[in-house]
């Protein structure tokens, strides 16, 4: 039963990714920029992946934040879901931490990390790198979508990683 639920969840994720990919490519996108509680967006994304955290026994480190950012709530939530999905996929055991540092959202995992030669290309459309080749479920679309969406929202994306030690993803928001 749990395996079937997991497969259903993954199908839902791929469908959602395809829909966001198509919407992002259209001439008119449905961005609605407004002041949003970052805490609310984070909690929604984490809630969606709660089962995966429990199933994989991955510890989540997160404390509520008071940060308000100007963004599109729906699109930012999709980005966070993609980043959590990647962190969970490539963290066989250990933890994932979410925090805010100097107004930027930081997601850090203790996963397998990304090879240094792959790092500059991880946001290219279709690029899966070494880790993606090892995991046949990898599409090479997730980080491309994250990068493209954040760029359109006027946010920044920075990824650093040490192979075998984990990955750190930082989303920067323009200061109002």
Explain the meaning of each model-derived region.
Residues 87-88:
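Short helix-loop "hinge" at the ATP-lid/N-box region of the Bergerat-fold HATPase_c
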Residues 93-104:
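Short beta-strand/loop element within the Bergerat-fold HATPase_c
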Residues 114-127:
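Short conserved segment of the HATPase_c
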Residues 32-50, 61:
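A conserved beta-strand-to-alpha-helix junction within the catalytic ATP-binding
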Residues 26-31, 64, 68-74:
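Conserved micro-motifs of the catalytic ATP-binding
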């Amino acid at each position: 039963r749990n395996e079937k639920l997991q497969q259903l969840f993954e199908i839902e994720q791929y469908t959602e990714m395809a829909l966001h990919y198509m919407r992002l490519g259209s001439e008119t996108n449905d961005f609605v920029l407004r002041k949003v509680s970052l805490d609310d967006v984070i909690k929604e994304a984490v809630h969606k992946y709660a089962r995966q955290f429990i199933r994989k026994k991955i510890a989540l480190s997160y404390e509520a934040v008071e940060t308000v950012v100007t963004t599109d709530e729906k699109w930012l939530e999709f980005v966070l879901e993609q980043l959590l999905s990647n962190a969970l996929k490539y963290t066989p055991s250990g933890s994932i931490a979410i925090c805010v540092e100097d107004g930027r959202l930081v997601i850090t995992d203790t996963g397998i990390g990304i090879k240094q030669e792959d790092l500059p290309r991880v946001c290219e459309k279709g690029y899966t790198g070494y880790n993606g080749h090892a995991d046949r479920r990898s599409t090479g679309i997730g980080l491309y979508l994250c990068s493209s969406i954040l760029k359109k929202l006027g946010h920044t994306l920075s990824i650093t990683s040490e192979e075998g030690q984990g990955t750190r993803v930082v989303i920067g928001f323009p200061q109002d």
